[in-house]
Amino acid sequence: MSFSFSQKKHSSGARLMTEGNIAKQLILFALPLLVGNLFQQLYNTVDSIVVGNYVSKTALAAVGSTDCIINTIIGFFSGLSTGAGVVISHNFGSRDDKALHCTVHTTIALTLVLAVFFTIAGLFLSPFFLRLMDTPEDVLPESSRYLTIYFAGVSGLMLYNMGAGILRAVGDSTRPLYILIVCAVTNIILDLVFVIVFHMGVSGVAYATIISQWISAILVLSILTKETNAYKLVWKDLRIDKATTLSILRIGFPAGLQMAVTSFSNVFVQSYINHFGSSCMAGWTTYGKLDKFCLLPIQSVGLSVTTFVGQNLGAGNMNRAKKGTTTALIIAIGTAIILMFPVLLFAPTLTSLFTQDEEVLAFGVRFIRLMMPFYIAICFNQIYANALRGAGNSTAPMVIMMGSFIVFRQIYLFIISKCFDTITSVALGYPFGWILCSVLLFIYYHKVGLHSKKKI
């Protein structure tokens, strides 16, 4: 079986990022990621809008309280996906067809195995985590029901994320966008039908989510099986190659551990939030949904720099990889500044999309106005961490982020809860952690750079 890398931009959608204008390459790659993630967040947000307006405040709090648990498991898998994407981008940049084919098939085989594990883990551990967060008794039954349904079908999300990650690693961020649009539209329609027409409540939102995720998984796997390049998925070639698996885990495990443990630490943060009651919980949920929208441009640029650095280092172009990192940081900071002002100005209007409860609205607006000015710090976190991962160094970002987002934040919350115990002081644990992380990553990047001690 032979494949060719004869064109800079392949008819299949793959894009070599080793030549051409750097800013243009990053933006062209990041834009489909941004639009796709906007659609993904749109249907997640519609879940909350539908539940908050057509079910109850308690149901909104129930859905929001599950985010930490869901993100813990998905975060670990996303880290592994990052590891696979870095290896694939290096294979693609160096034009190593054989290694690329092997990595793709090892990646999908690993995904199938891990999907079973995460499904079982989610189903069995969810009740424990809900209790650990001190979820209020009036919220607990609906939270538990939502998680049970969600984790029963979470394999679809994992297969889509890994399949889309393969396409993005070879520079194709367009077709994952189309799939996400289909997924978002499907999810929104099913939300409205299940909740408003059939009155299924929180269960209806959960079913809508897993059905749309499985549609996405089927579509992305179908695309990969129809490819003609080295990353074509051939089911009979699925196997777990030991050397490739170790390369993926060397990069992906630290990233996954950092994402999972950071998300898990949010379980404890959520317990501090829960202490202030269901109205505060619902307000925190509305802020969390808007927060994810605001972070999308920054995260999209961060993801683009991982692929950019990976491909250019695979091609042996260190200087271009460094220039790409600097350019990405400038783009991210500029975007954050542009977004900040309208969100702060229209905070009450944006929050009112989720609920008309005055107490919940007040909490939501307070959180938005408190946190938004600190988003520039997140730009440094996202760009430097993703650039280092693209270079095959995911251990340093893991240590720095876990130290900032977990150790520092938990110490801060423990102390502040004893001294002040106000919702403002609790919420400030997030931006203070962002600032510490950005300072440490800035220092590390400028002292060590993109040099990886081990060959990918």
Model-derived features: where do they sit?
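Residue-level signal for short hydrophobic patches within transmembrane helices
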Residues: 19, 23-42, 46, 69-76, ...
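Transmembrane helical elements of multi-pass membrane transporters/channels
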Residues: 28-47, 149, 160, 183, ...
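Short alpha-helical transmembrane segments in multi-pass integral membrane proteins
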Residues: 1-30, 88-155, 197-253, 309-374, ...
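Transmembrane alpha-helix boundary and packing residues in multipass membrane permease domains
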Residues: 33, 37, 49, 86, ...
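Small-residue-rich hydrophobic transmembrane alpha-helices
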Residues: 60-120, 157-176, 270, 283-347, ...
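Small-residue hotspots at the loop-to-helix junctions and early N-terminal turns
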Residues: 57-68, 144-147, 206, 278-293, ...
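Short runs within selected transmembrane alpha-helices of multi-pass transporters and secretion channels
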Residues: 81, 150-168, 176-184, 205-220, ...
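Helix-terminus/linker motif at the lipid-water interface of multi-pass membrane proteins
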Residues: 38, 42-60, 130-137, 193-200, ...
